[in-house]
Amino acid sequence: MLRSVRPNILVIGGADFVASTVSTLVAMLPGPVSYLPPNAPPPAGDDDAEMLVVPDISSLSQNRQREWVRWLSDADVRHPQIVATSEVPVYPLVKSDQFSGVLYYRLNTILLDMQTADESPARKSRER
């Protein structure tokens, strides 16, 4: 499914899990991959990547989030598969208006949330 449909994937978890998962996903794709730096703008129109790896999306500035939403909404732009990563859960940021809900749902067609039990916000709440 990941090869034919190429859904956007949001990977949440510790650095080792994220790196391993991204490596596995990249290995499954036969085309070129672009690794963007943190808080990077969307690629220019001449990028021929089949996959974009967008790290640490939880740290995208509000302006950068708007740029990504505009880019993803532009029907005239070819959109590669996006693998976005975060070491912290992004949905709480959406609920507190610190992260665009539109962007969140565009980036996580598939959500791989692999926080350990010790990292989970629910567990931390119970321990208080």
Predicted regions: what they are:
Residues 1-93, 114-127:
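AAA+ ATPase active-site-proximal loops
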